[in-house]
């Protein structure tokens, strides 16, 4: 055990899952002064909102006691509602498909939580994210996690240098199977706990039902781009670009897919065939651009990009515009680009940053049917 590390205080965001449990265990084994914090971001007494918070906190307590670290629960419900959930609802009202995990990392896990950790004398915060940080000169690079299937840099694309300088990601160099093995070997209470999936405040519940409690659904026509009415939709907010299931269109031939929305007239556009031309575009405009390093970027640069989590990288050219937005031009047409989702830029394994997809284009024209 290193004696130097005992002078370094690391506050670990513990969710009650195996990843954050192993994170705390590893840091404790390495001799750091470790404190576990459970973030309560959602009111689980609410009739609709469940994050299984009580069970999860019980697991945090069990693991913290096993590895011998102090633990606390901190309430970030107000911050979460104001910064993440309100944004989530506002995006759906606009007919877009938001990514609350990106906003949660930016505003809660690496802002509100980081500030709280610093009030406890933390030198660093650590989480169970599958990502890596590396010091290069005066800057910290954000790198993909070794486990390609679990890499979470897509959701961390908005982190700044000030945030990255304060974080540790002990799992970034591991495969998920290794993490489970460490948990089992250490006898951690969460070793066999199932991974959480989906959006935490929705939990295991039906997404449609959850959303309808906060936003009134407005059913309307489901049409082709040529205007043929094929049925009714339940409310534009329930559908995303490229969606196949839940359309209720029968008949022969290939399946039908959502290709766009007309918010003003409350119309959902659908077309037949996975590779229908209307699903493809060759560029987009992104807003809320943020870079993970402070070094000056050229106005135009070539890199790769992801337009959704776990998607294969696509080669792109990024043209930064005077208004701070970015035009992202694809080397080859891409299917089902979705406004509201994140576009994230990479140079090899380095996550350069990203932004929010705003408008979608093809052959120099904006695809108005997409949004």
From Swiss-Prot:
**Catalyzes what?**
S-sulfanyl-L-cysteinyl-[protein] + uridine(34) in tRNA + AH2 + ATP = 2-thiouridine(34) in tRNA + L-cysteinyl-[protein] + A + AMP + diphosphate + H(+)
An example Gene Ontology CC term for this record: cytoplasm
Q: Where does ATP bind?
A: 13-20, 39, 128
Please, one GO biological process term?
A: tRNA wobble position uridine thiolation
Provide the protein's localization: Cytoplasm
Q: Which pairs of Cys residues are joined through disulfide bonds in the record?
A: 104-200
Q: What class of enzyme is it?
A: transferase
The site (Interaction with tRNA) lies at 129, 341
UniProt keyword terms in alphabetical order: ATP-binding, Cytoplasm, Disulfide bond, Nucleotide-binding, RNA-binding, Transferase, tRNA processing, tRNA-binding
Look up the EC number in the record and give it: 2.8.1.13
Main location as per UniProt: cytoplasm
Q: Which family does it belong to?
A: Belongs to the MnmA/TRMU family.
Q: Which PANTHER family does its entry note?
A: MITOCHONDRIAL TRNA-SPECIFIC 2-THIOURIDYLASE 1, TRNA 5-METHYLAMINOMETHYL-2-THIOURIDYLATE -METHYLTRANSFERASE
Instruction: State what this protein does.
Output: Catalyzes the 2-thiolation of uridine at the wobble position (U34) of tRNA, leading to the formation of s(2)U34.
Quote the protein name from its UniProt record.
Answer: tRNA-specific 2-thiouridylase MnmA
Q: Gene name on record?
A: mnmA
């Amino acid at each position: 055990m290193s004696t130097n590390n005992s002078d370094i205080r690391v506050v670990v965001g513990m969710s009650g899952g195996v990843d954050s449990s192993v994170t705390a265990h590893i840091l404790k084994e390495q001799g750091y002064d470790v404190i576990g914090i459970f973030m309560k971001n959602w009111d689980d007494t609410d009739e609709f909102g469940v994050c299984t918070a009580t069970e999860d906190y019980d697991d945090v307590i069990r693991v913290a006691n096993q590895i011998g670290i102090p633990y606390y629960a901190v309430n970030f419900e107000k911050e979460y509602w104001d910064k993440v959930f309100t944004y989530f609802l506002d995006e759906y009202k606009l007919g877009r498909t938001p990514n609350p995990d990106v906003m949660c990392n930016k505003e809660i896990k690496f802002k509100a939580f980081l500030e709280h950790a610093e009030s406890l004398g933390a030198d660093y915060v650590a989480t169970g994210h599958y990502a890596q940080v590396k010091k290069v000169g005066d800057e910290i690079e954000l790198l993909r996690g070794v486990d390609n299937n679990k890499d979470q840099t897509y959701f961390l694309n908005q982190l700044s240098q000030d945030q990255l300088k304060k974080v540790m990601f002990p799992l970034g160099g591991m495969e998920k199977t290794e993490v489970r093995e460490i948990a089992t070997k250490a006898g951690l209470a969460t070793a066999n706990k199932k991974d959480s999936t989906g959006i935490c405040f929705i939990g295991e519940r039906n997404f449609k039902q959850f959303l309808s409690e906060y936003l009134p659904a407005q059913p309307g026509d489901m049409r082709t781009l040529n205007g043929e009415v094929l049925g009714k939709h339940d409310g534009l907010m329930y559908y995303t670009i490229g969606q196949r299931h839940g359309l209720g269109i029968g008949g022969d031939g290939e399946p039908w897919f959502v290709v766009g929305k007309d918010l003003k007239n409350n119309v959902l556009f659908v077309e037949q065939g996975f590779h229908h031309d209307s699903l493809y575009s060759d560029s987009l405009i992104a807003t809320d651009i943020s870079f993970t390093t402070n070094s000056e970027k050229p106005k135009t640069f070539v890199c790769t990009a992801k337009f959704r989590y776990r998607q294969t990288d696509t080669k792109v050219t990024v043209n930064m515009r005077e208004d701070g937005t970015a035009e992202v031009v694809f080397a080859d047409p891409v299917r089902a680009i979705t406004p509201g989702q994140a576009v994230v830029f990479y140079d090899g394994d380095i996550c350069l940053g990203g932004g929010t997809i705003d408008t979608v284009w093809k052959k120099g024209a904006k695809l108005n049917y997409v949004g």
